[in-house]
Amino acid sequence: MLRISVRLAFLTALVVAPPAFAAMANDPQITRGKYLVTLGGCNDCHTPGYFFGNPDMSRFLGGSDVGFEIPGKGVFVGRNITPDKETGIGSWTPEQIVKAIQTGERPDGRILAPIMPWHAYAELAADDAMAIAAFLQSLNPVSNQLPRPVKPGEKISTFMFRLVPPGETSAVAAK
């Protein structure tokens, strides 16, 4: 009876906590990925509350609560990059995550928002890019439905920062 209980407990742990189990399976890669995500400042745009000085670490990388306006392009919100299958990148493979980080292309062929600095990550070593993907997949999924990107001139429903290219400050200030 005790043997059956131990087996059931073990099987339940495997089913209930797959991200934690995955993290244990390749800890050095996950650790490296966490380091690179921290160094790359991913939380800046992808963690709620970060820009207000009060990051909500229970929703770490679960998507921002701030939009970024790029004049002439619209307003974009940092997406949920946790493994939530509905609102995050939980259905993406590690290779698809790496492609998005390094080329700015999503699995469905759409291009990431212009604010995503994929150009800065285009030359990451393959091992480093895969470490980032492994770390992101090891996180607890965060369900967080975010506003869609907003076209120029459309009404927005979130706080936003306006990014102003050099030389355009006086035109934007006049608005």
Where are these regions (language model features)?
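Bacterial N-terminal signal peptides
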Residues: 5-19
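The canonical Cys-X-X-Cys-His
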Residues: 33, 39-49, 97, 132, ...
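Second-shell loop/turn segments in exported
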Residues: 83-89, 118-120
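An amphipathic alpha-helix signature
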Residues: 94-98, 102, 126, 130-133
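Alpha-helical hairpin
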Residues: 89-92, 124
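Flexible coil segments in periplasmic/lumen-exposed cytochrome c-class electron-transfer proteins
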Residues: 27-28, 47-76, 107-175
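Electrostatic cytochrome c docking/interface patches
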Residues: 21-38, 51-54
